[in-house]
């Protein structure tokens, strides 16, 4: 994408770009449309998605991306109210398993009754959930949950999206993590049936799959921990302690370097069961550290009454917006009545009644109508939008790597990777131009300390995709992921420049907008952490320490709802800082607050070590004496 483009081409449909990425990655791997689409949709339907002529449903689209090792979080998606409602109900089931089996079983049956028309991925999820329930109810697989019955149930889960003699074709199949989980359940059932050799063969097929298909670590982290749990069980039953250790350590390191806590607690508990006799001193020390991680995460989960051994869907919604909510917010931002908002120029797109139903979530607009309705507000349309205008998944991965480096405050590496990104993209595209300017502004701030210049650059970057922001009601603007990050950094610089009124104005704007976008999922949008850090700092400036502690504890609780927990260590440090400062203001509460700040500080230390967050590790070392002695 190195040639020049005109303004008309810059306004091209972003959904087409995502289709191009899908097609390019498919062709690069020499995969036919029929093979990629197998079990989900027809090859012809996939062709329409690749050409940008059709959109996709959230669940199906996620599986398509994951089958090629692509990370859905590199895209922003739009879904219907129905899709997000279904996601929420599946998430509620996940939170109940394995601790509350009766309630989980009731919710599963409710789901089946409520949604008689289900996608293959939904049906697969329900079968997997039922399998785990039966397994946990009868731990040895006997009685109602007899091993052969479990095997039949696991087979049904696999066949929802995988056709044919899949056991003989594993190497050539295109599989998403959710599909491989179903195969692992078949392996678990075979183990319970006494066929350990077959169970091991299936476990190894899944264990080796990500590397064989050249998946990046972030993609592999979605399945290797689950594979390790079965592999470690099999290995220890056969007395192979070292094999169990090696698989467990590899899976744990993958979670640590991906900043994830999904399936972390079961993995840590399994590591504790490994006999130490065959391990050397370094390996035993590693397991000792793993025990510290287990203690800390159990403490965190108890603090927020969060089910640490829950199951996960493998589908995140932090980057997914609801079509009706987006249209409603943009209409309110522009001050348009419903009667005016139904027009695309001179042409009426939908009736007022239809728009009301769309905004309320009763109806989802057609792909074409959604495009026409949203463009009147200056937004690019599409069910799926790449984080940058590129036809390269490699570029999107590089952008995500830079985002992780920013979160870890590795500014020299950010600068290096930014130059690499610059050589791979076309700066004429709005999102690319915005990303480059945003990263440059961060470096001006973090490396040069020039707050004023950085503020100007950030404000300019925000205007690239939100040029009419000053002309509408800002709190109703649909701040997309990068816009929220930029606006959050603007807020923090305004605070540092001593402009509290402007800081509070931006905080209220972003809090309102993100609350609307959260909708019925209950999951905060990506970049929520940027907002909460700025909010905490503002409350500290105002000496509202008790409110700041509550805000950081609320943020920590929300971070646990995501598979990734990258900023959890920073949230706990903020709790420690605010408790310490509050004790200075309220000496009568010092003893209780001292206990709070010491515990929060220690948790922050362990979390920073868990995630290899060197910046926070060193930051905390410098302050250890203050908080712990």
Whereabouts are the PLM-identified features?
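Amphipathic alpha-helical segments of tetratricopeptide repeats
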Residues: 66, 108-116, 151-167, 204-215, ...
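Alpha-solenoid helical repeat architecture
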Residues: 76-89, 118-125, 161-181, 214-226, ...
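A short, Lys/Arg-rich alpha-helix, primarily the initiator
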Residues: 1-28, 303-335
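"A position-specific structural signal for the A-helix of alpha-solenoid helical repeats
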Residues: 90-91, 122-133, 184-185, 223-230, ...
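Structural motif corresponding to the intra-repeat A-B loop/turn of tetratricopeptide repeats
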Residues: 29, 98, 137, 193, ...
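Short alpha-helical DNA-recognition segment
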Residues: 27-48, 332-357
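DNA major-groove recognition helix of helix-turn-helix/homeodomain DNA-binding modules
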Residues: 57-74, 366-384, 628-629
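Helix-turn-helix/homeodomain-like alpha-helical modules used for DNA recognition
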Residues: 84-137, 393-448
């Amino acid at each position: 994408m190195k040639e020049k483009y005109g303004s008309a081409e810059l306004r091209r449909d972003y959904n087409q770009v995502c289709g191009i990425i899908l097609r390019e990655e498919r062709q690069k791997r020499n995969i036919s449309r029929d093979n990629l689409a197998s079990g989900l949709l027809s090859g012809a339907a996939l062709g329409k998605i690749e050409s940008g002529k059709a959109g996709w449903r959230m669940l199906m689209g996620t599986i398509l991306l994951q089958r090629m090792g692509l990370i859905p979080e590199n895209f922003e998606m739009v879904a219907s109210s129905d899709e997000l409602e279904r996601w929420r109900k599946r998430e509620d089931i996940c939170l109940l398993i394995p601790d509350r089996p009766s309630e989980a079983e009731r919710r599963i049956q409710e789901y089946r009754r409520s949604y008689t028309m289900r996608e293959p991925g939904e049906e697969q999820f329900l079968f997997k959930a039922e399998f785990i329930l039966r397994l946990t109810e009868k731990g040895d697989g006997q009685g109602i949950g007899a091993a052969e019955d479990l095997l039949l149930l696991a087979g049904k889960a696999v066949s929802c999206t995988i056709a044919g003699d899949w056991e003989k074709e594993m190497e050539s199949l295109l599989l998403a993590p959710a599909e491989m989980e179903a195969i692992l359940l078949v392996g678990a059932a075979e183990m319970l049936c006494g066929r350990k050799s077959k169970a091991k063969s299936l476990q190894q097929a899944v264990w080796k799959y990500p590397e064989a298909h050249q998946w990046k670590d972030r993609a592999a982290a979605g399945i290797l921990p689950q594979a390790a749990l079965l592999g470690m069980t099999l290995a220890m039953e056969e007395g192979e302690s070292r094999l169990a250790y090696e698989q467990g350590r590899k899976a744990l390191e993958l979670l640590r370097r991906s900043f994830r806590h999904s399936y972390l607690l079961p993995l840590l508990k399994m590591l504790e069961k490994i006999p130490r006799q065959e391990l050397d001193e370094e390996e035993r020390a590693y397991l000792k550290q793993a025990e510290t991680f287990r203690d800390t995460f159990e403490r965190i989960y108890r603090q927020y009454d969060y089910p640490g051994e829950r199951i996960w869907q493998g589908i995140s919604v932090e980057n997914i917006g609801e079509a009706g909510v987006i249209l409603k917010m943009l209409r309110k931002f522009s001050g348009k009545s419903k009667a005016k908002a139904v027009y695309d120029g001179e042409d009426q797109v939908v009736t007022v009644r239809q728009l009301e139903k769309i905004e309320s979530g009763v109806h989802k607009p057609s792909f074409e109508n959604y495009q026409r309705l949203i463009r009147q507000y200056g937004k690019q349309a599409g069910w799926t939008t790449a984080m940058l205008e590129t036809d390269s998944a490699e570029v999107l991965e590089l952008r995500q790597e830079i985002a992780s480096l920013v979160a870890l405050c590795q500014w020299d590496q950010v600068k290096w990777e930014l130059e690499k990104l610059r050589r791979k993209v076309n700066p004429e595209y709005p999102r690319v131009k915005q990303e480059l300017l945003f990263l440059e502004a961060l470096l001006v701030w973090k490396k040069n300390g020039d707050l004023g210049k950085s503020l100007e650059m950030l404000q300019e970057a925000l205007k690239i995709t939100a040029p009419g922001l000053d002309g509408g009601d800002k709190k109703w603007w649909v701040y997309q992921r990068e816009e929220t990050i930029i606006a959050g950094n603007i807020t923090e610089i305004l605070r540092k420049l001593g402009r509290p009124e402007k800081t509070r104005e931006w905080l209220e704007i972003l809090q309102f907008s993100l609350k609307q976008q959260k909708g019925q999922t209950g999951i905060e949008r990506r970049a929520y952490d940027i907002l909460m850090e700025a909010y905490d700092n503002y409350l500290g400036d105002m000496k509202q320490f008790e409110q700041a502690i509550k805000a950081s504890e609320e943020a920590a609780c929300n971070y646990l709802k995501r598979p990734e927990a990258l900023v959890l260590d920073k949230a706990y440090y903020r709790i420690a800082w605010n408790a310490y400062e509050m004790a200075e203001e309220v000496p009568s509460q010092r003893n209780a607050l001292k206990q709070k700040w010491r515990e929060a500080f220690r948790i922050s230390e362990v979390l920073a070590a868990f995630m290899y967050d060197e910046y926070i590790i060193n930051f905390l070392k410098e302050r250890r004496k203050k908080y712990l002695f």
